[in-house]
């Protein structure tokens, strides 16, 4: 297992390479073709940025993210009635930034209005017709579903976000296309869209299955990000978890010996070679699953370590030149294995932000997993002023001091400590604690130590 200091160092190195190139986070000119800074690629980057901030608490990182949201006045790319799932990606990060400072309800206005317009029935189920939409949209619904309505009175109505979220998920998973969805319940992998339900022509000219790596990464990471905030008693939590666990097993089986995953999970000879963005998604999701006790550390920890080493050693540039911190092997935007080829150690993707965000997400979970003897977790507030803490002990110990940290407005903290008895001399055991009578909003984390 890489030490925490090295994991964090690699994350900071990669992020600094990006922020040095783009010091103004909200500008439109810092994206190809003058795209607005609320585009999904930049939103995905900030998913990882906030993951980095949660573990190093660097104010400059937080301020960089706030500047990004402030520039468009916390709006979505195409307005409050926008029907594109992609554009809800920015809203996910607005919600998280609100959770860091719950006095700033303006950060919620546009994403709440947008999701409300969906829930009211103005947006049909066919908006989720490509697997990317799960990642861009699903966590936004989940995050809104657990916010305290009293805190954002006047914004959130009585809409039930979780049931509507499931309606979209069920549609794309089990209905859309040929009436059985984009998810293959036998292979436990996803077709990116209906164009790939039939075998397609691979790069060697043969007809093969196409399970696009990053497309499956979108779904896998989205399930983790969704379950991370949903209460476990959510009506459909069990299905999300089962899908996640089935995918994990399928993904583990097709990892390359070098730790990467191919661009096509269904056929290794289709544009063979390493690819970073899908690898980062899978590494993130599996590490999250181990951290929360949903995946066996014995089974999946080697896969996670190999995935991270592929990214941090095989893809991340460590040099004395301008490329120091550049992440290689990243496929450009697209929808299939052929897009952005050739993908190499030095190839520059058309957007340099989203792959980095996924790398930072993976690092944020591996950092928690690498802690000894326990791990540090982010834990969202559930209903009734409770927070649920799930963690897996990595090393053998008999008890741990659990420190609950509330992170709200920057610079404030509230702590409480309790000692929990743990299974004697057994590593890899998962625990769940529920803490009650806490502040109704905010983000919490648990730190276990001897």
Q: How should each PLM-predicted stretch be described?
A:
Residues 20, 70-74, 120, 174, ...:
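Amphipathic alpha-helical segments of tetratricopeptide repeats
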Residues 131-132, 142-266, 271-283, 295-343, ...:
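Extended ligand-binding clefts on enzyme/binding-domain cores
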Residues 2-46, 51-91, 97-110, 114, ...:
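CBM-like carbohydrate-recognition segments
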Residues 9-17, 75, 124-127, 185-187, ...:
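Surface loop/turn signatures of beta-propeller and other carbohydrate-active proteins
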Residues 105-139:
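Asp-box/WD-like beta-propeller blade repeats and closely related beta-sheet repeat scaffolds
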Residues 372-450:
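Short, composition-biased motifs enriched in small/polar/acidic residues
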């Amino acid at each position: 297992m890489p030490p925490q200091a090295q994991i964090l160092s690699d994350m900071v190195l990669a992020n600094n390479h990006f922020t040095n190139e783009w010091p103004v986070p909200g500008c439109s000119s810092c994206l190809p073709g003058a795209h607005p800074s609320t585009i999904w690629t930049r939103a995905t980057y900030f998913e990882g940025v906030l993951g980095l901030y949660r573990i190093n608490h660097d104010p400059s990182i937080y301020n960089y993210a706030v500047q990004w949201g402030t520039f468009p006045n916390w709006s979505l790319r195409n307005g409050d009635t926008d029907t594109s799932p992609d554009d809800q990606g920015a809203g996910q990060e607005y919600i998280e930034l609100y959770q860091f400072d719950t006095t700033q309800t303006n950060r919620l206005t546009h994403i709440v209005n947008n999701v409300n317009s969906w829930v009211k029935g103005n947006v049909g189920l066919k908006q989720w017709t490509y697997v990317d939409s799960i990642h861009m949209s699903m966590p936004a619904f989940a995050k809104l579903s657990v916010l305290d309505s009293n805190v954002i009175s006047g914004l959130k109505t009585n809409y039930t976000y979780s049931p509507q979220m499931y309606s979209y998920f069920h549609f794309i998973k089990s209905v859309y296309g040929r009436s059985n969805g984009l998810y293959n319940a036998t292979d436990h992998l996803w077709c990116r869209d209906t164009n790939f339900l039939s075998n397609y022509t691979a790069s060697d000219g043969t007809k093969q299955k196409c399970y696009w790596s990053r497309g499956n990464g979108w779904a896998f990471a989205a399930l983790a990000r969704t379950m991370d905030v949903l209460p476990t008693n959510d009506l459909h939590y069990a299905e999300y978890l089962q899908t996640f666990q089935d995918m994990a097993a399928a993904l583990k089986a097709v990892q390359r010996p070098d730790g990467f995953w191919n661009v096509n999970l269904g056929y290794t000879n289709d544009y063979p070679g390493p690819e970073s963005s899908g690898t980062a998604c899978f590494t993130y999701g599996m590490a999250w699953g181990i951290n929360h006790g949903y995946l066996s550390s014995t089974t999946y920890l080697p896969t996670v370590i190999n995935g991270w080493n592929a990214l941090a050693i095989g893809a991340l540039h460590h040099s004395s030149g301008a490329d120091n911190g550049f992440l290689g092997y990243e496929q450009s935007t697209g929808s299939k294995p052929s897009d952005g080829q050739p993908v190499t150690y030095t190839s520059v993707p058309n957007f340099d932000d989203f792959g980095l965000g996924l790398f930072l997400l993976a690092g944020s979970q591996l950092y928690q997993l690498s802690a000894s003897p326990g791990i540090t977790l982010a834990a969202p507030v559930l209903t009734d002023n409770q927070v649920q803490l799930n963690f897996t002990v990595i090393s053998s110990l008999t008890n741990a001091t659990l420190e609950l940290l509330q992170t709200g407005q920057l610079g404030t903290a509230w702590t409480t400590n309790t000692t929990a008895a743990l299974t004697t001399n057994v590593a890899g055991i998962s625990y769940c604690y529920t803490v009650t009578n806490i502040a109704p909003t905010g983000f919490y984390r648990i730190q276990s130590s001897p």
